[in-house]
Amino acid sequence: MNDKELQTIRSRCEKATGGKWTAYIEGRNIECGSSFIQTADNDLEIIGATIADYDFIAHARQDIITLLDEIERLRSKEA
């Protein structure tokens, strides 16, 4: 991937709701009627999502930034 592609990905992440995202799964974490993803601003409910989908989406907010930072760190070592 080139720097422009990585910056485009980082920009999408930065435009998303900030803060940690957490998946709350009915029957696993909560007993309130429906699963949701808690963000810093609002709760997100996704119709038709599986438990794996909720976990993936919630973790992507943090994981993608971590991966981009690691790519940047590794590239700076090569320079």
Which residues fall in each region the model found?
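Extreme N-terminal leader/activation tails
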Residues: M1-D69, R73-A79
